[in-house]
């Protein structure tokens, strides 16, 4: 049996997420996956070029000003993603030590310290 009532369908515009800062920052954070895809494609191209002895093509590709600009934008996006992740992690992860909740700043600073140490280790390994 069918009903004659009309179902209420709430109108949702395509720019709904631009109204509140929280949603805007969330959508920007989620859009950083594009930067990750770009980085993975460049890395894949570099590995393939290295294996096929076409490293000169990859070096000239990497020196293209457009690629450099895209890499800088990608780095900024990835840093934004990491920064927002490190701010959110203490809010959703509860660590209890001796029946007391760990200070969220300790966890956030520990994440940044680990990131810095891993980055420093990568730089040392590259330039040895």
From Swiss-Prot:
One of its GO terms (molecular function) is succinate dehydrogenase activity. The keyword Transport does not apply. Its main location: membrane. InterPro entries: Fumarate_red_C, SQR/QFR_C/D. It is a multi-pass membrane protein. It comes from the Bacteria. It is found in: Cell inner membrane. The keyword Transmembrane helix applies. One of its GO terms (cellular component) is fumarate reductase complex. Gene3D superfamilies: Fumarate reductase/succinate dehydrogenase, transmembrane subunit. The chain crosses the membrane at residues 31-51, 67-87, 106-126. Keywords: Cell inner membrane, Cell membrane, Membrane, Transmembrane, Transmembrane helix. Anchors the catalytic components of the fumarate reductase complex to the cell membrane, binds quinones. Belongs to the FrdC family. Part of an enzyme complex containing four subunits: a flavoprotein (FrdA), an iron-sulfur protein (FrdB), and two hydrophobic anchor proteins (FrdC and FrdD). This is Fumarate reductase subunit C. It comes from Haemophilus ducreyi (strain 35000HP / ATCC 700724).
């Amino acid at each position: 049996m069918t009903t004659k009532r009309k179902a209420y369908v709430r109108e949702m515009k395509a720019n709904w997420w631009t109204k509140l800062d929280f949603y805007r920052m969330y959508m920007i954070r989620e859009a950083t996956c594009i930067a990750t895809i770009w980085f993975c494609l460049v890395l894949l191209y570099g590995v393939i070029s290295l294996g096929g002895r076409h490293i000169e093509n990859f070096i000239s590709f990497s020196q293209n000003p457009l690629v450099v600009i895209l890499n800088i934008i990608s780095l900024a996006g990835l840093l934004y993603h990491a920064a927002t992740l490190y701010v959110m992690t203490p809010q959703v992860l509860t660590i209890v030590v001796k029946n007391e909740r760990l200070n969220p700043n300790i966890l956030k600073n520990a994440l940044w310290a680990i990131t810095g140490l891993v980055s420093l280790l990568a730089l040392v390994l590259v330039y040895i």
